Amino acid sequence: MQVSKSYAWRGAGKETRKNSPLLPSNIRGLIIGKSNCGKTTAMMNLLLQKDWLDYELLHVFGKSLHQREYKILRKGLESGLSKAQISNIFENQDALNIDPVKLIEIYLDQGGTADGKIKANFYSDCSSQVPDPTELNELQKNLLILDDCLLEKQAKAEAYYTRGRHNNCDTFYISQNYFRLPRQTIRENSNLIILFPQDSKNIAHIHADHCTDIDIKEFKDFCNAVWRVRYNFVTIDLTSSKLNGKYRENFDNFYFPNT
């Protein structure tokens, strides 16, 4: 029998997401690192830079929504600003002499245009308010972010790593600790891992979980070389081979293992 792909039901809208070619077409991502290492900045780059993440409805759950970056993002998206308009605020922050949230209010009050189409919901409750993936509209390009939700029950978060792709939802879990994440659901089903500095023991465990196609010493040397530059991070794209971008410095500087 010749196996035909026609018998895999694609569904309307599910093939229209166009993330960057440097990212998986459907993302189950982890961003891991200690406090103040740059995790939120990396997430904002993915959210706001042109042609990286393709999404129409953003859901953010977390205990860190008081951070200035999230306040600006929330105000911008809820006010109808586009990615480019919100990016412009971040890129020109040194020239601002006013609170950026207030700036958005003044801009709109004075007749400024808001040409964004992304809808967004922000919640400080990481457990009861997280919808089941089946509750999402699969015809929309959904993006879910779980930030610092490790102390809450993980059942709903786990569902996005096992069933989220069936409901047209990309997911990022931002956490200070990789090994406290559920192994058989979140860790083993992740396909994009962004790592900020880790100690030698943690590097060894991550290598054992995902990176046995590279020598452990070479992997440690690669990670430590990347992390010598402050705020740099290692990207591991588990949908790519080691000779086609699995290992990277930041998002787009490929590393080709010698082993």
Task: Annotate each language-model stretch with its function.
Residues 58:
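An amphipathic, basic-hydrophobic helix/alpha-beta surface used to engage anionic
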Residues 183-259:
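Conserved GTP-binding G-domain of TRAFAC-class P-loop NTPases and closely related GTPase folds
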